Structures are given as structure tokens and as C-alpha cells.
Amino acid sequence: MLFSLRNSGFFAIGLLLGHAGHADPDTYIRAGAIVDVEAGVVLDGRTIAIEDGVIVAVTPSSEVSIPSGAGLIDLSDYTVLPGLMDAHTHLLSDSDDHGLNSLVVSLPEATINGVKNAAITLQAGFTTVRNVGAPGYADVALRDAIAAGEIAGPRMLVSGPGIGITGGHCSDNNLLPYEYGVTENGVADGPWAIRQMVRQNVKFGVDLIKTCSTGGVLSAGTRLDAVQYTLEELEALVDEAHMHGRKVAVHAHGTAGIRNAILAGADSIEHASFLTEEVIELAKERGTPLVMDIYVTEHILTEGEASGVLPESLEKEREVGQIQRESFSRAHDAGVAMVFGTDSAVYPHGDNARQFSRMVQFGMTPAEAVRSATVLAADLLGVGDQVGRIAEGLQADLVAVSGNPYEDVSILENVEFVMKGGVVYREP
């Protein structure tokens, strides 16, 4: 097995610099089975041909004669899936950096955390992530270093600093007293200040815009149901972002904030906790995907106090956790698009796949849960022509597990093989 970051207390320099993987100019993967995530079926005995990191053929193994000298990866005892995708991550934060603990994390330390957590996330089988909120555009640098092959990590789409109101969830500096005079990177009030902040984020290289239209669980002094940004302000933000070809992810727990975000044209709603039937129908009508992190409540309520989560945040999580899960079930049953996103860093990085079983518990089939982290996530992120399926012409981003994830989706918590762009980062 290649060096396993997930199960080790230190990191191999070779892997972090991107040299632990290997790729052949012509590679064949002999799979015991592959998952067709579009059709929702498992196909036995397939061989995947890869050239220069791209899938060039997917063929029944009985019909394939592998050329002499070609690279062969034998996964005949495994089921192969497209690389998994998480649409709501915070790679530059750690799960013990909550509450007052967050005040001692410098930007350089956050950047180093990002290098570590990117490698852990890739080892867990997540080959693409959308990072929604990071200080100082450090996520832009992390994305670029991964893309250049300088460090190991998933493909990243990044937002830079979240944009939010003074004193809101996206400007969570409420732990500091007034005399410090600290204002976080993304604070903007009023339509024109918001447009300027969108332009600044675009200038510094973001792939998308993240904003907050309600308070949050982990931000001090904010209410989950309180609207942050008026409809006018959100419309200005979305309009400016779309002018620059950037999608918008909106953090929203409360009903009014969710409604405003959908009406403003948001491309996804994050958390979406307090859903009414009216808002569910509005999301369905507008085709607005929901990214609902229904695993994190367990970690917050069992481990949160030890990791610095504030008492008021624990109380808010007790209020919202079960309600969010019930909203998830109702939105799913109504046919709203649901995309896999976990809010990693609230819980330890690498445990992303634990959410699959909760999605099934609260209404999805295993096939739907897998689809939410592949095809649907790729569509939301705008990369469906590159990743998200095992198909000719797409990047060779592949993971393998022992067993059938459509029979037991929890096996995705134990990925045994990871390939990204034709390079192997983990193998049995």
C-alpha cells in the first residue's frame, strides 16, 4: 500500500510534494465492477483504459486484450467508482479550531493546515472539492499548488473569503472586543460595497463567491433565523458574480434567508435547515440545489465542547440538527436537487464519507447518495465535462472499495484505491 496519510501521525515529504504517485503513458485498470452513477447500476467485469490521465475507453474485460508492456492495475477484487466530490469544505481550518481556539490560528498556520488537510481529503477518496470560505486567499494558493503538482490534494474550486455583513456569520470576529478594531476580509455592507468585494475576490483568483444570508451555528452572537443581507443586497452580489462568470454559494439556515437567496438567483443553498413547503417548492421550481451537511450535528454535540465550540453554538446545534435532517427528508421527497457537501473542518478531515449513510438514513437510496457526490456535484461545480463519471474523455479520477456501495453505502468510508488524473495516490 502507498503511504497512508489518513492513518499516520506524520506526512511523507514525497507525497506532499506530489512525487508519491505514479502514472504510465498507457494504463489499464481491470475492475471487478464499476459503478455507472448516471444509470444507477453496477456493471461487472470492466476494463478502463487511460492515456495521459484521461479515460479513453471503458470496455467489458472479456473483450479486452491488454498490450504487452502496458501498465496494468489489477482491481479485479474491487468496485471502482468515479472520484468522490465534496461541495462544502474548509480545508484551511481544523476541527479543533472552534470558538476562542480560532483566535490563535495565524494565516501561515492555516495555510499549512490546508496542505495537510488537502492530502488527507484526497486519501479519503475525494478527488474534487469546493472550498467555501478561507482567509487571505490562501485557498487560491493551495488550489494552484495542487494543480501544478507541487503538493498532493483534490482538485479545488475556491471562494476566498466569504462575503458578509458587519457582525455576521461570514465576518465572524465577534469574539474580539471592540477596541481591537478587527474587520475580516470579506465584510461589505450595501449593494455597491458588495459589488466591490465580489470584484476584489475575482481579482485575486476565486472560482466562486461564498456569502451568508443568515446567522450560523458556530458564529458568536448570530441567530440562525436572522436575515443577513437584504434581497436587494443579495441580488447585487449574485448579479455581479454572474457578470464575472462565478457561481454563488449562499450559507442560509433560516427560512427567510433561504427564500431571499433563491429569489436572488443563488446557485446553491448551503445548510438549508429551516425549510417550509413554500421554500421547497421554490427551490424545485428555480432548480436551486441544496447542499445540506447532515452529518456534522453528531460531531458537534459529542466532540464540540472539547474542540472549543462555544456553549451558545452547542445550544444552536441542539436546536437545528434534527430540524435540518427532517428538512433534508422533505426536500428529497419533493424532488429538489441535493448535492453532497459536509462542512469539513467542523469534523475531522478525511471523515467526509460518513455523511453517505446519514443521507440514506434520512431518505435517499444509496445510488442517490453516490450520485449526489459525483454527477450532481460535478454539475453544480461546473466541471461535469471533466469529472464525475467513468466515461471516455473524462479525467481518470477513480476510487475503489471492497463490496457494492449500492448495497452498503458505508463502505465508502474505507476507500482502498485513489487515482486522480491518472496518478495513483492510494492502492491496496
Task: Name what the model sees in each region.
Residues N113-D139, G153-P161, V206-S219, K247, ...:
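Divalent metal-dependent hydrolysis catalytic cores, especially in the metallo-beta-lactamase
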Residues D24, I34, A39-L81:
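Histidine-rich, glycine-flanked metal-binding segment
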Residues D24, V182-A264:
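Metal-dependent enolase-superfamily TIM-barrel catalytic cores that perform enediolate-based chemistry
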Residues V104, M243, K247, E312, ...:
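His/Asp/Glu-enriched, well-ordered alpha-helical/loop segment
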Residues Y78-E150, I165-C170, N174-L176, E232, ...:
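Metal-associated gating/positioning segment near the N- to mid-region
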Residues D144-G162, L224-V250, G287, V291-Y295:
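Alpha-helix-loop-beta-strand connector modules within alpha/beta enzyme cores
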Residues S93-A110, T166-V182, V217-L231, R286-G321:
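Active-site gating loops and adjacent loop-to-helix segments of metal-dependent hydrolytic enzymes
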Residues S95-G99, S219-G221, I258-A264, I294-V309, ...:
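Histidine/acidic-residue-rich catalytic or RNA/ligand-binding cores of hydrolases
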